């Protein structure tokens, strides 16, 4: 890396999403000049707490809360213009300048009303057929990615050419309306409603459309530090997650390059975000899941103290013990440079903590999460018991001020996974962060 170029950091979730990436991205943008979303859509939900004020973001990079920081939506993101402007207007009402700082790749596929209709109708169809639901958010993410892979998607750049857009839309809508009405038993979507809304959005989007790949490469060469913000988590990755209970994009660090148009050599440090316990929204295997609905249980403690409800859907998150064998898999596929442990404070007051170090599977033991959902369903976790702590960790900003048992817990995670812990978050507040090694300064 030349001394004249910037240093770039990728932030990824290592579990099933909801690890607290938004807060850490916001915190790290103090050292960055640009923040990039590279996959997913408005199914992501990042919550930031700044000076006691809570802000929920779904599509716009978390760096928008730092004045002067440029924000980019890369080509790997599927874009709902309707939801984007809903989010922009909410931020502008709060006094945040957005439009002059947001750049959107013209190569982003568009999420249109029929994508959400397909998403919801398919889940209903699965349920009626007695098949377990995938657990989609119903936002149209999967169907939009399907159109992209099938090479029939309408992209942001198509909005600049109304006649071309109308022609492509008519063909696409005919296809999807056939599936909606003839296969899924859902109502058809009206062409004029979709087209008219898209044209209204086109006029608003044009000033923000950009060649994001070129702008990022130019910024890097000019010395800017960039931060690539992942959405969801590694175990929701379409290739490396608990398939088919996954999202429709690659959530791993390697996709930061493909999803934004930079070379992999521009990714200098990979920060894995992981909760001090595990949570999951929706269906799919979860080896260390606890009873999180019964008062008085550790799972209930995690659910209530951790306020475990989805930012995007409001659904309750399933809760369980920390899974170090799962984290080994995440470290492997992401090439993690370091870890940030979040929500350590949620474990305050638990007398004993169980740490999953591996699994029993079909009469054998393994120390890493298997690849297939069917295999994971058959896994019985192997636990190591550690002593908890009664002292409060809320707001602690120095590692040596943590309770002894909290430090031992963190050290054991490092030992099992082989990944150093460089940061610890002790509350949702931006400033309640322990820094052992800064990603923008680490070797």
Curated annotation (Swiss-Prot):
Positions that bind substrate: 311-317
Subcellular location(s) of the protein: Cytoplasm
InterPro entries named among the record's database cross-references: Adenylosuccin_syn_GTP-bd (IPR018220), Adenylosuccin_syn_Lys_AS (IPR033128), Adenylosuccinate_synth_dom1 (IPR042109), Adenylosuccinate_synth_dom2 (IPR042110), Adenylosuccinate_synth_dom3 (IPR042111), Adenylosuccinate_synthetase (IPR001114), P-loop_NTPase (IPR027417)
Gene3D superfamilies: Adenylosuccinate Synthetase, subunit A, domain 1, Adenylosuccinate Synthetase, subunit A, domain 2, Adenylosuccinate Synthetase, subunit A, domain 3
Residues that bind Mg(2+): 18, 45
Domain of life according to the entry: Bacteria
Binding site for IMP: 18-21, 43-46, 137, 151, 232, 247, 315
EC number(s) from the headed UniProt entry: 6.3.4.4
Protein transport keyword on record: no
Pathway recorded for this protein: Purine metabolism; AMP biosynthesis via de novo pathway; AMP from IMP: step 1/2
Classification via Pfam families: Adenylsucc_synt
CDD domains attached to this UniProt entry: AdSS
Single GO cellular component term: cytoplasm
GO biological process, one term: 'de novo' AMP biosynthetic process
Active-site positions on this chain: 18, 46
Textual note on the cofactor: Binds 1 Mg(2+) ion per subunit.
Catalysis performed (reactions): IMP + L-aspartate + GTP = N(6)-(1,2-dicarboxyethyl)-AMP + GDP + phosphate + 2 H(+)
Molecular-function GO term, any one: GTP binding
Cofactor(s) it depends on: Mg(2+)
Alphabetized UniProt keyword annotations: Cytoplasm, GTP-binding, Ligase, Magnesium, Metal-binding, Nucleotide-binding, Purine biosynthesis
Disulfide bonds: none
Statement: the UniProt record of this protein carries the keyword Magnesium: yes
Quaternary organization: Homodimer.
Family stated for the protein in its record: Belongs to the adenylosuccinate synthetase family.
Purpose: Plays an important role in the de novo pathway of purine nucleotide biosynthesis. Catalyzes the first committed step in the biosynthesis of AMP from IMP.
Protein name, as recorded: Adenylosuccinate synthetase
Gene giving rise to this polypeptide: purA
